[in-house]
Amino acid sequence: AGCDHSQGIYIYXXGQGNGV
């Protein structure tokens, strides 16, 4: 599943970030 929204994009990997 994806979770990195640091750049406002749903990235597959998972991570931390505050974006859209």
Swiss-Prot record:
Keyword Thylakoid in annotation: no
GO cellular component: nucleus
Enzyme type, top EC level: transferase
Chief site of localization: nucleus
Swiss-Prot/TrEMBL GO biological process terms: N-acetylneuraminate metabolic process
Listed EC numbers: 2.7.7.43
Cofactor binding comment, as recorded: Mg(2+). Other divalent cations are less effective.
Subcellular location: Nucleus
Activity modulation notes: Inhibited by CMP-N-acylneuraminate.
GO MF annotation terms: N-acylneuraminate cytidylyltransferase activity
Sorted UniProt keywords: Magnesium, Nucleotidyltransferase, Nucleus, Transferase
Subunit structure: Homodimer.
Role this protein plays: May play an important role in the regulation of sialic acid metabolism.
Protein name per UniProt: Putative N-acylneuraminate cytidylyltransferase
Species in which this protein is naturally found: Rattus norvegicus
